[in-house]
From Swiss-Prot:
The record marks 109-110 as: Cleavage. It is found in: Secreted. It comes from Oryctolagus cuniculus. Belongs to the endothelin/sarafotoxin family. The keyword Secreted applies. Endothelins are endothelium-derived vasoconstrictor peptides. This is Endothelin-3. Residues 1-17 form the signal peptide. Residues 24-83 are annotated as: Disordered. GO terms for cellular component: extracellular space. Disulfide bonds join 89-103, 91-99. One of its GO terms (molecular function) is endothelin B receptor binding.
Length: 114
């Protein structure tokens, strides 16, 4: 491959590695919902999906399948966003190696069976 293509590929991967999109609610009608202006230091913050790195968040039915009386996937198709996994790390970018390292150590520690 030519060096220019390698550089383009490397820049694309590097740029994509630090991007963590915040979930958007409301679908096509989002324009009618007023949003607060972004604060300069708040890049990477998702208020409704950020969890403390020390707090373990597990759904009450995480290990169970759908119960016989529950609608299952049909409920998610009707407009319910379904189960969304919360963000455990509050690192602003993946380029913050120290934050990512300690956050993932904490996740591994929490998920390790005794």
């Amino acid at each position: 491959m030519e060096p220019g293509l390698w550089i383009l590929l490397g820049l694309t991967v590097t740029a994509a590695a630090g991007f963590v999109p915040c979930p958007q609610t409301g679908g096509a009608g989002r324009t009618s919902v007023p949003r607060a202006p972004r604060v300069a230091g708040s890049e990477g913050d998702c208020e409704d999906s950020v969890a403390s790195p020390r707090r373990q968040t597990v759904a009450p039915t995480a290990g169970k399948g759908p119960s016989p009386g529950s609608p299952g996937r049909g409920q998610a198709a009707e407009g319910d966003p379904g189960h969304r996994r919360v963000r455990r790390c509050t690192c602003f970018t993946y380029k913050d190696k120290e934050c990512v390292y300690y956050c993932h150590l904490d996740i591994i520690w929490i998920n390790t069976p005794e």
